[in-house]
Amino acid sequence: MKLHLASGNLHKAEEFAVLAAASARDDAPAIEIVSARAMGGMPEVVEDTGTFVGNARKKAAALRVRLPAGSWVLADDSGVCVDALHGGPGVESAYYAGPEASGRANYEKLLRVLADVPDERRGAYFFCLLLVLDGAGAEYVFEGRCQGRLLREPRGSAGFGYDPIFVPDGFDRSYAELGEDVKNRISHRARAWAQLAEWGRRS
């Protein structure tokens, strides 16, 4: 199965490639991830639907029109949902500090907003929604989440986005400190991918 990734985020492309390789089995067809960069780049998409599934659907549709008929597309929309912010920034996580904001700018803004929130109220979870468009245009949706808490300052140099300030439940290190191997076993994206991979083996 070849999935064309509807994302211009190089970090996501690398993460999906690792997840696909890790989920490969001898008794099932391999899943190949083709990055948008390999297809001339990802078209610009305004993520304005207000929902994870709506944004993923827009991204998938934008890339699909550039591909040969019958191509399969994978779109991802994800974010960090903070208890003290009633689930925010959520679907707006990628541009929390502005439309061109970096991952660092986004998490620094979040830390400022939460500056007066005590440790016991800094619960949060990462959420990932994966949407597959098959060759006939049918949609398949997979979801994953990872519960945890937010730090008061960034820790670690690996990962991207909000990784340096998020500590998953059961650990005392941030996503950015845990390293790729651990993160790709427990993350929100890994959990959504596990569902997708299992579906792919059954299809």
From Swiss-Prot:
Any one Gene Ontology cellular component term annotated for this protein: cytosol
Biological processes, Gene Ontology terms: nucleotide metabolic process; purine nucleoside triphosphate catabolic process
Gene Ontology terms for molecular function: dITP diphosphatase activity; ITP diphosphatase activity; metal ion binding; nucleotide binding; ribonucleoside triphosphate phosphatase activity; XTP diphosphatase activity
Cofactor(s) for this UniProt protein: Mg(2+)
Keywords attached to this entry: Hydrolase, Magnesium, Metal-binding, Nucleotide metabolism, Nucleotide-binding
Classification via HAMAP family: Non_canon_purine_NTPase
Protein role: Pyrophosphatase that catalyzes the hydrolysis of nucleoside triphosphates to their monophosphate derivatives, with a high preference for the non-canonical purine nucleotides XTP (xanthosine triphosphate), dITP (deoxyinosine triphosphate) and ITP. Seems to function as a house-cleaning enzyme that removes non-canonical purine nucleotides from the nucleotide pool, thus preventing their incorporation into DNA/RNA and avoiding chromosomal lesions.
The name this protein goes by in its record: dITP/XTP pyrophosphatase
Source species of the chain: Opitutus terrae (strain DSM 11246 / JCM 15787 / PB90-1)
